């Protein structure tokens, strides 16, 4: 086992926010979240998919995602449509993924990106830079991820903080 711990500091703001989130989760547990209207569930699913895709620069939007879920054809680039289909498939399997299993992360990545990347389901093999951030070299990504997942599996930290 390694001694890796992600670099973070628990501040009073983090404690306050995590307490508020825990309180809201407790309320949901006692109000029966399973009883949520199926139409509301579908709307929330569409909003989640749209938000996830927008982060990656896909702006097909809620209307087109709704149409895709309803089995209709929509206009978009091959990549945009593949991203939507991949996100839908990955979200459908969400309950089967284990948060502390690296293989599950790679499987989710494969499902999500299978139509887009020939290397879907594996770590990158090239250098990348996002804005001013230079990511770690490809040769150490596997080790870094193994360390992170070992921490996720073995840390006594509260699950809410681990999820950040």
Predicted ranges, named:
Residues 1-164:
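FIC/Doc superfamily catalytic core
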């Amino acid at each position: 086992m390694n001694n890796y711990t992600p670099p973070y500091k628990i501040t009073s703001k983090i404690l306050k926010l995590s307490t508020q989130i825990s309180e809201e989760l407790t309320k949901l547990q006692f109000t029966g979240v399973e009883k949520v209207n199926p139409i509301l569930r579908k709307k929330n699913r569409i909003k989640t998919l749209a938000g996830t895709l927008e982060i990656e620069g896909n702006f097909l939007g809620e209307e087109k995602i709704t149409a895709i879920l309803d089995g209709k054809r929509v206009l978009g680039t091959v990549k945009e449509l593949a991203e939507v289909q991949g996100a839908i498939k990955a979200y459908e399997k969400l309950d089967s993924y284990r948060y502390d299993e690296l293989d599950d992360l790679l499987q989710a990545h494969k499902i999500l990106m299978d139509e887009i990347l020939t290397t879907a389901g594996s770590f990158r093999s090239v250098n990348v830079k996002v804005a001013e951030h230079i990511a770690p070299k490809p040769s150490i990504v596997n080790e870094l991820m193994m360390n992170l997942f070992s921490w996720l599996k073995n840390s006594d930290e509260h699950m809410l903080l681990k999820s950040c």
